[in-house]
Amino acid sequence: MNEQYSALRSNVSMLGKVLGETIKDALGEHILDRVETIRKLSKSSRAGNEANRQELLTTLQNLSNDELLPVARAFSQFLNLANTAEQYHSISPKGEAASNPEVIARTLRKLKNQPDLNDATIKKAVESLSLELVLTAHPTEITRRTLIHKMGEINNCLKQLDNTDIADYERHQVMRRLRQLIAQSWHTDEIRKQRPSPVDEAKWGFAVVENSLWQGVPNYLRELNEQLEENLGYKLPVDFVPVRFTSWMGGDRDGNPNVTADITRHVLLLSRWKATDLFLKDIHVLVSELSMVEATPELLALVGEEGASEPYRYLMKKLRARLMATQSWLEARLKGEKLPKPDGLLTQNEQLWEPLYACYQSLQACGMGIIANGELLDTLRRVKCFGVPLVRIDIRQESTRHTEALGEITRYLGIGDYESWSEADKQAFLIRELNSKRPLLPRNWEPSNDTREVLETCKVIAEAPKGSIAAYVISMAKTPSDVLAVHLLLKEAGIGFAMPVAPLFETLDDLNNADDVMTQLLNIDWYRGLIQGKQMVMIGYSDSAKDAGVMAASWAQYQAQDALIKTCEKAGIELTLFHGRGGSIGRGGAPAHAALLSQPPGSLKGGLRVTEQGEMIRFKYGLPEVTVSSLSLYTSAILEANLLPPPEPKDSWRHIMDELSVISCETYRGYVRENKDFVPYFRSATPEQELGKLPLGSRPAKRRPTGGVESLRAIPWIFAWTQNRLMLPAWLGAGTALQKVVEDGKQSELEAMCRDWPFFSTRLGMLEMVFSKADLWLADYYDQRLVAKTLWPLGKELRDLLEEDIKVVLAIANDSHLMADLPWIAESIQLRNVYTDPLNVLQAELLYRSRLTEEQGKSPDPRVEQALMVTIAGVAAGMRNTG
């Protein structure tokens, strides 16, 4: 065990040493000494030395304004380097990869050992695999794209240094490159100067495809194919690619006025342009590789006399010319020029697939399978995974925007006010219009700007090439009319196909009503005819947790999914559950494998569709090797969940969960909504107000510019509590409820639930993870430095509650310390704490100075403001999840 970590620790200390040399070269010995002193004090304070803890506080409080930024940057950059080393460790032969026998192989062996499963059943489950990852631009990806690129390069250096056969002069070269990269990072500003636009966010998404997924996906499929051949004697069909990517960047307009119909149109074009760019590179390689002469009569007929001497190359060159023509046309469109479509414009995947597949079949038939299964196979699989659109886009809009648009239309037509009608009247009107042959929209009508925007967006969907838009998600969906309204607006825009429209249920009440809403919809004949046996429903994790606390929210999510699965099964509808999980626990994040196996039985039959958010995209898909490992984890979890579904919970367990849910929700809301001191405490004990200044995402932090906690988006709400280490949204209410049930004499029942029910054990595991990252003395320090004395009792009460909660969870899980079953994560948190602690203390100090300046009516000191931004980014890196 320790041998594994020693490789990680030595990489971390080596990177730290190089960073130290860089700081010394840039700023002189005295700053490096200052940083080193703070690091040593922090280490000793972590080990329990109280005197050194006090000295640490004094040292950081006494830093001059000139020293603030260098010290903050030193610890922040160190944490980025530690994260890079850790990411490398997860794929290095000396690290996790060594102790982690191939995850898919392990799952296949486990499945083969089940007496009631045969190879044919397993093969069928593999063939129905479907994984759709939806990349979202959450404002939580704090690290700039330029630094992410440098971190990737550092990773390559670590890989080269791991090679035992490396010659001395090569080692010196790699070390020199490492020093250059770390120096470049040090001399780069880590905080963006302005907010990214939605187009910038989309480009960030394309960069992930280019730098990692493009290579990672074919590698993952090779890995999967090898394991299936070895364990089942089964080869993946060439056209079988179970994974696809969709993006919300440029399509998600919920609460983001910056995402307009024009932006979506632009991003769709940009995405196609990027696809032609990447496929051109592939085809360029194939033109040079496929110089073979021998071909089947079919292929020779396809190329004619002109291409007979080098048939494969001839076809590739023709495809290259089409790609280039398509790219030029897209470039002109992006510049706003209106050009006629050229001959051979690529708009559908088949146009790419056919010439490539013809070459593949011919090579196979002529005994050149080894060549066919090289670069050509990788490109074919990319066509299936990415294709002409590169990534498909989801459109997301809030339900009230559709209601308001229809209200405006009905008022203009003089048939009443749609907004004030009852649900029954709305449904009757919508179904009548959906069945009508005449258009609803009047010809020369001038809608308001908001309504025009909604109608324009529907037009973009209707005009986009088929297959480039994946789904229309309705946030804050509450009623059947919310879904029918979108279908009507799409019909009016002239859409020629049935677009999947997914209601998103995200508050506690909406989750509890989800089954009822879907049952009503499925009872409408017109609707049943439209959806052709398929329905997608999105489950919101972050808003329900913010509304009711994690325990009540996770039980409501479980029950909603369970009820929807059963309703759709009965109705003969294939249900795809779309999970809107976040990276952090308060937004539903959990290690993928555990999270999937803790869902209700049958929840993955329709495949898995899940959001991958902000900073999690980098941790899970930042490098091709990490991509392979993340996709393999998902694959094995889906196979296992479908073939060895978790048990149906006993009725007594359901009753206990109902009880836990009620108590925890009351406790949570008792503080967050009903305690008059809570909002002022939250505003002063966390950097919530200052977070608004960080130029993170393109989306405003609040749904409405004024208002309390309820109007805050779920992400800043969680981000703020992560910064002061109280981690409140991820645990408040849960432990109190567990304690109450234990006092009622049900501890042994809770222990059984923990042992035998993945849903419950995952909940406790997630609480342990949060408790490991929370820190009482730091949360206390924020209070002392920033909070009015009258509010101190509330802070103390919350910290006492946290301490109690930790004891309760450990007792139920029968563990002596947190994270006993995941030592690797515990180790990683401990490793980072030494560097995160000084940033937290410094942040409290900076918040104090910044607020004092504001109170005195002076203008802010740019050194303080800049250092504050760096500590926020640094703590986020230390916690490995922002919001």
Curated annotation (Swiss-Prot):
Sorted UniProt keywords: Carbon dioxide fixation, Lyase, Magnesium
State the top-level EC class: lyase
GO CC annotations? cytosol
- Is Ubl conjugation found in the keyword set? no
SUPFAM superfamilies assigned:
Phosphoenolpyruvate/pyruvate domain (SSF51621)
Q: Which cofactor does it need?
A: Mg(2+)
Catalytic activity reads:
oxaloacetate + phosphate = phosphoenolpyruvate + hydrogencarbonate
Residue numbers annotated as active site: 138, 546
Q: Name one GO biological process term.
A: tricarboxylic acid cycle
GO molecular function terms noted in the UniProt entry: magnesium ion binding; phosphoenolpyruvate carboxylase activity
Give the transmembrane region(s): none
Give the enzyme's EC designation.
4.1.1.31
Keyword field contains RNA-binding: no
- PANTHER family recorded: PHOSPHOENOLPYRUVATE CARBOXYLASE
Family in the record = Belongs to the PEPCase type 1 family.
Q: What does this protein do?
A: Forms oxaloacetate, a four-carbon dicarboxylic acid source for the tricarboxylic acid cycle.
Q: What protein name does the entry list?
A: Phosphoenolpyruvate carboxylase
Q: Which organism is it from?
A: Salmonella arizonae (strain ATCC BAA-731 / CDC346-86 / RSK2980)
**Gene that produces this protein:** ppc
